[in-house]
Amino acid sequence: WATDGHKWLNVPYDSGYAFIAHPAAHFKTFTSQAGYLKEDGKARDEYNWTPELSRRARGYTTYAVIKELGSTGIENLVERCCRHAAAIVEGAGQLPHTEVLAYPIINQGLLRFKNPLGGDVESLHDQFTEQVIAAINASGEAFFQPSTFKRKRCMRVSVSGWRTNEEDVRRT
């Protein structure tokens, strides 16, 4: 399986991880054979385990975060982000002209904003949703991205910042 360290651990953007059940297959896939790349066989050389020769040190940032937070800290971070996402979606979902398209399963949910002028014209709701997202982002209070779900424009609520707190959620 694979996961993204950027989202949950707030490490550099290109820190993804793949957990492989068969080390020999993993090694064979990524091994770089060249005459000038010598191995003494005494220690694992990371260039044989990553897609690019230039990424050997990428794991240090992840190691530092895991060492600092520990398993309990990581668990608390993930649970807090999930709780904040749910609170934002549930709170916003109670506002007039707001429709919850997807409640968070983990840390992401989807909201749609219906044009208060009425009507069932989807394009008007799409436009209004885009306007609401632009206004929120322009305020600087929060940042959301637009998305499309089942042909409806919506606002993607995604919480993964370790500094996000209850006051941020309340203001949002």
Mark where each language-model region is.
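Active-site C-terminal subdomain of aminotransferase-like
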Residues: A2-L95
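A generic structural motif
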Residues: K7, E68-S71, N115-L117, G161-N165
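Short, hydrophobic beta-strand segments
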Residues: A64-V65, L110-N115, M155-S160
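Generic non-transmembrane alpha-helical segments
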Residues: A87, G91-L95, Q131-A142
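Conserved PLP-binding catalytic core of the aspartate aminotransferase-like
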Residues: E99-I136
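Conserved PLP cofactor-binding pocket of PLP-dependent enzymes
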Residues: Y103, Q108, A138-R156
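PLP-dependent enzyme catalytic core of the Aspartate aminotransferase-like
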Residues: F149-T172
